[in-house]
Protein backbone atom coordinates (compact mmCIF):
# COMPACT_ATOMS: atom_id res chain seq x y z
CA UNK A 1 0.00 0.00 0.00
CA UNK A 2 2.84 2.41 0.88
CA UNK A 3 4.49 1.75 -2.49
CA UNK A 4 1.23 2.64 -4.32
CA UNK A 5 0.81 5.89 -2.34
CA UNK A 6 4.42 6.86 -3.00
CA UNK A 7 3.95 6.26 -6.74
CA UNK A 8 0.72 8.32 -6.77
CA UNK A 9 2.40 11.20 -4.90
CA UNK A 10 5.34 11.12 -7.33
CA UNK A 11 2.99 11.17 -10.34
CA UNK A 12 0.96 14.09 -8.93
CA UNK A 13 4.12 16.05 -8.14
CA UNK A 14 5.45 15.48 -11.67
CA UNK A 15 2.12 16.61 -13.18
CA UNK A 16 2.10 19.74 -11.00
CA UNK A 17 5.64 20.63 -12.05
CA UNK A 18 4.76 20.18 -15.73
CA UNK A 19 1.69 22.43 -15.41
CA UNK A 20 3.68 25.22 -13.79
CA UNK A 21 6.13 25.14 -16.70
CA UNK A 22 3.46 25.77 -19.36
CA UNK A 23 3.64 29.19 -21.01
CA UNK A 24 1.11 31.74 -19.83
CA UNK A 25 -1.84 32.25 -22.15
CA UNK A 26 -2.76 35.89 -22.71
CA UNK A 27 -6.41 36.51 -22.00
CA UNK A 28 -8.39 39.39 -23.45
CA UNK A 29 -10.77 39.54 -20.51
CA UNK A 30 -13.34 42.17 -19.62
CA UNK A 31 -11.07 43.37 -16.82
CA UNK A 32 -8.64 44.69 -19.44
CA UNK A 33 -11.03 47.47 -20.40
CA UNK A 34 -12.30 50.32 -18.28
CA UNK A 35 -13.47 53.91 -18.29
CA UNK A 36 -13.20 57.18 -16.46
CA UNK A 37 -14.75 60.52 -17.26
CA UNK A 38 -16.27 63.77 -16.16
CA UNK A 39 -19.39 65.82 -16.69
CA UNK A 40 -19.98 69.55 -16.64
CA UNK A 41 -23.03 69.90 -14.39
CA UNK A 42 -25.25 72.92 -13.73
CA UNK A 43 -24.09 74.82 -10.59
CA UNK A 44 -21.21 72.38 -9.95
CA UNK A 45 -19.03 72.79 -13.03
CA UNK A 46 -16.71 69.91 -13.93
CA UNK A 47 -17.40 66.85 -11.79
CA UNK A 48 -15.46 63.60 -11.93
CA UNK A 49 -17.33 60.50 -12.93
CA UNK A 50 -17.54 57.68 -10.44
CA UNK A 51 -17.27 53.94 -10.87
CA UNK A 52 -19.92 51.72 -9.32
CA UNK A 53 -20.70 48.04 -9.81
CA UNK A 54 -24.22 47.41 -11.01
CA UNK A 55 -25.09 43.70 -11.07
CA UNK A 56 -21.35 42.99 -10.93
CA UNK A 57 -20.58 45.13 -13.99
CA UNK A 58 -18.26 48.14 -13.83
CA UNK A 59 -20.37 51.22 -14.54
CA UNK A 60 -19.21 54.79 -15.17
CA UNK A 61 -21.68 57.29 -13.70
CA UNK A 62 -21.67 60.93 -14.86
CA UNK A 63 -23.90 63.71 -13.52
CA UNK A 64 -26.27 63.78 -10.55
CA UNK A 65 -29.52 62.15 -9.50
CA UNK A 66 -32.36 63.71 -7.53
CA UNK A 67 -30.91 67.22 -7.69
CA UNK A 68 -32.64 68.52 -10.86
CA UNK A 69 -29.30 69.60 -12.37
CA UNK A 70 -28.63 69.50 -16.10
CA UNK A 71 -25.59 67.82 -17.60
CA UNK A 72 -24.03 70.27 -20.08
CA UNK A 73 -21.10 68.24 -21.40
CA UNK A 74 -19.42 64.88 -20.93
CA UNK A 75 -15.95 63.45 -21.47
CA UNK A 76 -15.38 59.68 -21.49
CA UNK A 77 -11.88 58.17 -21.33
CA UNK A 78 -11.50 54.58 -22.49
CA UNK A 79 -8.73 52.40 -21.04
CA UNK A 80 -8.29 49.71 -23.69
CA UNK A 81 -5.73 47.08 -22.72
CA UNK A 82 -7.44 44.26 -24.61
CA UNK A 83 -5.06 44.09 -27.54
CA UNK A 84 -7.96 44.91 -29.89
CA UNK A 85 -7.87 48.07 -31.98
CA UNK A 86 -10.59 50.64 -31.50
CA UNK A 87 -11.91 53.21 -29.09
CA UNK A 88 -15.13 54.76 -27.81
CA UNK A 89 -16.97 57.54 -29.63
CA UNK A 90 -19.96 59.58 -28.53
CA UNK A 91 -22.08 62.49 -29.64
CA UNK A 92 -24.66 64.57 -27.83
CA UNK A 93 -27.78 66.56 -28.66
CA UNK A 94 -27.56 70.04 -27.09
CA UNK A 95 -30.29 72.51 -26.31
CA UNK A 96 -30.56 75.08 -29.16
CA UNK A 97 -27.62 73.66 -31.16
CA UNK A 98 -28.65 70.06 -31.88
CA UNK A 99 -26.25 67.20 -32.52
CA UNK A 100 -22.47 67.42 -32.25
CA UNK A 101 -20.16 65.45 -34.51
CA UNK A 102 -18.84 62.14 -33.15
CA UNK A 103 -16.19 62.76 -30.50
CA UNK A 104 -13.41 60.33 -29.55
CA UNK A 105 -12.26 59.13 -26.12
CA UNK A 106 -10.92 61.93 -23.93
CA UNK A 107 -12.61 64.77 -25.84
CA UNK A 108 -15.53 66.80 -24.41
CA UNK A 109 -18.94 66.74 -26.09
CA UNK A 110 -21.42 69.49 -25.27
CA UNK A 111 -20.95 73.03 -23.99
CA UNK A 112 -19.59 74.71 -20.87
CA UNK A 113 -20.46 78.15 -19.55
CA UNK A 114 -23.49 78.53 -21.82
CA UNK A 115 -26.18 77.00 -19.61
CA UNK A 116 -27.26 74.56 -22.37
CA UNK A 117 -28.61 71.16 -21.38
CA UNK A 118 -27.78 67.84 -23.00
CA UNK A 119 -31.00 66.23 -24.21
CA UNK A 120 -29.83 63.01 -25.86
CA UNK A 121 -26.71 61.04 -26.66
CA UNK A 122 -25.31 58.14 -28.65
CA UNK A 123 -22.24 56.04 -27.81
CA UNK A 124 -20.42 53.45 -29.93
CA UNK A 125 -17.23 51.40 -30.01
CA UNK A 126 -15.01 51.26 -33.09
CA UNK A 127 -12.51 48.87 -34.68
CA UNK A 128 -11.97 45.30 -33.46
CA UNK A 129 -13.24 46.39 -30.05
CA UNK A 130 -16.76 46.69 -31.50
CA UNK A 131 -16.60 43.06 -32.65
CA UNK A 132 -15.88 41.78 -29.14
CA UNK A 133 -17.66 44.22 -26.81
CA UNK A 134 -20.96 46.07 -26.54
CA UNK A 135 -21.31 49.52 -25.03
CA UNK A 136 -24.58 49.98 -23.21
CA UNK A 137 -25.80 53.13 -21.56
CA UNK A 138 -28.79 54.59 -19.78
CA UNK A 139 -29.75 58.18 -19.06
CA UNK A 140 -31.85 59.72 -16.32
CA UNK A 141 -34.18 62.19 -18.05
CA UNK A 142 -36.03 65.11 -16.49
CA UNK A 143 -39.62 64.01 -15.69
CA UNK A 144 -39.13 60.52 -17.22
CA UNK A 145 -36.37 59.17 -15.00
CA UNK A 146 -34.84 55.87 -16.16
CA UNK A 147 -37.92 54.73 -18.12
CA UNK A 148 -36.01 54.23 -21.37
CA UNK A 149 -33.81 51.51 -19.90
CA UNK A 150 -30.47 50.42 -21.36
CA UNK A 151 -29.66 51.07 -25.03
CA UNK A 152 -26.72 49.65 -27.00
CA UNK A 153 -24.09 50.48 -29.61
CA UNK A 154 -25.06 53.85 -31.03
CA UNK A 155 -28.78 53.82 -30.22
CA UNK A 156 -30.36 57.08 -29.08
CA UNK A 157 -30.70 57.62 -25.32
CA UNK A 158 -32.73 60.62 -24.21
CA UNK A 159 -35.12 62.82 -26.17
CA UNK A 160 -34.96 65.43 -28.90
CA UNK A 161 -37.55 68.16 -29.38
CA UNK A 162 -39.04 67.74 -25.89
CA UNK A 163 -36.82 70.20 -23.95
CA UNK A 164 -35.94 67.56 -21.33
CA UNK A 165 -32.54 67.67 -19.63
CA UNK A 166 -30.24 64.71 -19.05
CA UNK A 167 -29.34 64.56 -15.37
CA UNK A 168 -27.30 61.36 -15.15
CA UNK A 169 -25.56 59.02 -17.58
CA UNK A 170 -24.49 55.42 -16.86
CA UNK A 171 -22.13 53.60 -19.24
CA UNK A 172 -21.00 49.96 -19.28
CA UNK A 173 -18.76 48.00 -21.63
CA UNK A 174 -19.58 44.30 -21.68
CA UNK A 175 -18.23 41.32 -23.67
CA UNK A 176 -20.46 40.13 -26.53
Feature locations, PLM:
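Sec-dependent signal peptide cleavage junction
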Residues: 10, 19-33
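Bacterial N-terminal signal peptides that target proteins for export
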Residues: 1-12
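Lectin-type carbohydrate-recognition ectodomains
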Residues: 29-176
Amino acid sequence: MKKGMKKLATTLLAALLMITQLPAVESKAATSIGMSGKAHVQSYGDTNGRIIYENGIETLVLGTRGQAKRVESITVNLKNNTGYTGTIQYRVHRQTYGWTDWTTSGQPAGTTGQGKRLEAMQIRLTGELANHYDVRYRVHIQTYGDNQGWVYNGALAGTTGEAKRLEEVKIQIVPK
